[in-house]
């Protein structure tokens, strides 16, 4: 994930990242809009502006996560509660599911899968939140 400056998005708080494969090739774009504001819907979600697929000329995914965390004062880190961190990991799991999709047909790309499977990647990611190595690095 490499932050990409200079891309116009819906709000100055939203950030854009180019996602690259291990070989350096571009995989897609990830947009993160994490802070609450008066004009923003409540809740947290992942969605795709563009699904990734190989049909025809194919398309690279453009995935976004929206959260409603309290914005910290300028220059300070955003501190999250355990529940907020769990939500972040859950929605980022959905984002990775959308970003790492490798399918021919757009109709089955990313989270466009059976209801009994769509929550699996996000819930697995939630559980990584409590892995000691993850806590040591990010908490």
Residue map of PLM features:
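Cation-handling catalytic/transport regions enriched in His/Asp/Glu
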Residues: 1-139
């Amino acid at each position: 994930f490499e932050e990409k400056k200079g891309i116009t998005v819906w709000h100055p708080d939203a950030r854009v990242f180019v996602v690259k494969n291990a070989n350096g090739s571009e995989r897609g774009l990830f947009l993160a809009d994490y802070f609450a504001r008066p004009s923003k819907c409540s809740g947290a979600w992942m969605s795709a502006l563009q699904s990734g697929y190989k049909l025809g000329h194919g398309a690279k995914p453009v995935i976004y996560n929206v959260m409603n965390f309290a914005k910290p004062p300028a220059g300070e880190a955003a501190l999250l509660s355990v529940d907020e961190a769990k939500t972040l990991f859950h929605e980022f799991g959905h984002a990775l599911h959308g970003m790492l999709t490798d399918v021919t047909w757009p109709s089955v790309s990313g989270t466009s899968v059976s209801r009994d499977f769509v929550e699996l990647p996000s819930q697995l990611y939630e559980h990584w939140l409590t892995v000691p190595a993850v806590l040591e690095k990010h908490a």
